[in-house]
């Protein structure tokens, strides 16, 4: 598997597999394989999270993760704390031109 690392931080990395033509987002103990279209959609989902809204919602959970991201799998929601969300943004908020550099 020939992976080009696009971005990396303490929580994970975003890479591109030339062999399979997919982006690989590893984040803590999560691996998500995304097509170009799926990465663009995920980018928009992450970008549009209303941080102020979710910060003000009382969280009675023992794990203090306030920021949910719904997935297409009905019974799976990814949850992040503020620092994890910022790290996730750092990985997936790449420009259109940078993304296209890898797929062309």
What are these regions (language model features)?
Residues 1-104:
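Positively charged, low-complexity terminal tracts
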């Amino acid at each position: 598997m020939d992976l080009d690392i696009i971005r990396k931080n303490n929580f994970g990395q975003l890479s591109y597999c030339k062999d399979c033509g997919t982006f690989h987002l590893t984040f803590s103990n999560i691996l998500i394989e995304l097509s170009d279209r799926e990465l663009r959609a995920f980018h928009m989902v992450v970008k549009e999270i209303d941080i102020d809204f979710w910060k003000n919602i009382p969280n009675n959970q023992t794990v203090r993760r306030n920021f949910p991201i719904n997935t297409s799998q009905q019974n799976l929601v990814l949850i992040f704390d503020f620092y994890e969300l910022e790290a996730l943004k750092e990985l997936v908020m790449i420009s259109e031109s940078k993304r296209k550099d890898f797929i062309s």
